């Protein structure tokens, strides 16, 4: 049923609905080009409140503090490249302290990422960074979504 449902809705909407199902009530965010659809989906869900901050590191620390205080899941939404790398200290804090958080980073169009060009470049797309490689050692799970139909499995 979920796989059928995902074909008629945006991935961004599905992600936000899953956050609500996981008990998330607040998402700490800095909007950007890479999160356009995610920010739109967040704004449309009545059960989620967007908390906009001025820096990605603030968002990551806010998500960690919120999760600790609420004894639940903290959520952070940031854009691509430098925006995602700005969250790494908060990600590490969550990892070291065993705090449950989800850090969602926007991404460029797949054909504009170093993973898909086949060219040995440090960056290819606008504000791109291979955030998955950077955070894999300090997370339980890090993934770059490459096919919309994989979102159900990724969010599980």
Listing of model-derived features with the role each one plays in the protein:
Residues 2-156:
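N-terminal alpha/beta PP-like core and its mobile active-site loop of ThDP/TPP-dependent enzymes
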């Amino acid at each position: 049923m979920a796989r059928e449902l995902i074909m008629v809705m945006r991935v961004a909407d599905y992600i936000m609905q899953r956050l609500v199902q996981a008990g998330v009530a607040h998402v700490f965010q800095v909007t950007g080009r890479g999160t356009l659809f995610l920010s739109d989906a967040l704004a449309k869900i009545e059960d989620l409140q967007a908390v906009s901050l001025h820096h990605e590191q603030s968002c990551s620390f806010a998500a960690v503090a919120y999760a600790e205080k609420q004894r639940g899941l903290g959520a952070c939404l940031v854009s691509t490249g430098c925006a995602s790398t700005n969250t790494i200290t908060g990600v590490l804090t969550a990892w070291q302290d065993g705090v449950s958080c989800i850090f969602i980073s926007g991404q460029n169009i797949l054909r504009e990422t170093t993973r898909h060009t086949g060219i040995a470049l440090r960056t290819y797309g606008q504000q791109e960074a291979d955030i998955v490689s950077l955070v894999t050692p300090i997370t339980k799970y890090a993934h770059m979504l490459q096919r919309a139909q994989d979102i159900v499995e990724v969010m599980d």
